[in-house]
Amino acid sequence: MKKLTKEQILMIHNELIRETGGSVGLRDEGLLDSALNAPFQGFEDVDNFPSLQQKGARLGYGLICNHAFVDGNKRIGAHIMLLFLSLNGIELEYTQEELSDLILNVAAGKLQFEDMVKWVIKHQV
C-alpha cells in the first residue's frame, strides 16, 4: 500500500491554494496528524479500516471535517482521497457535480464516513 507523507500533503495543499485561491496555512497540526493517521490505525491485529476504499474515504473525511487548514479543507480532502486511491490502483469514474455534492454534503454534516465509503465503491471502475 502506498501512503502520502505529511510533507507531500502540505506541499499539495500549498499548490492547490496557489492554483485555486485562498489562504495558505495550517490552523492545527494535531488535527492534521489525526486526519492522516486515522485510516491506518487499529487495535492489536485488527485494522480499523481494512480496505483501501475505507482508508481513502477516511483520509478524505478526516481532512474535510477536522479543518486542520486555514482554507481549502474540502479541496485537499477530495484531492488526497482521490490521489491515495489512484496510487493504490483504485480508479473512480464520476462527474464533477457528483464529487462536489459528496464533498459539500460531508462538510455540511449531511453525509458521514460510511456514506463516503459507499460513494467510493459505487464509483469504482
Which sequence ranges carry the predicted segments?
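FIC/Doc superfamily catalytic core
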Residues: M1-V125
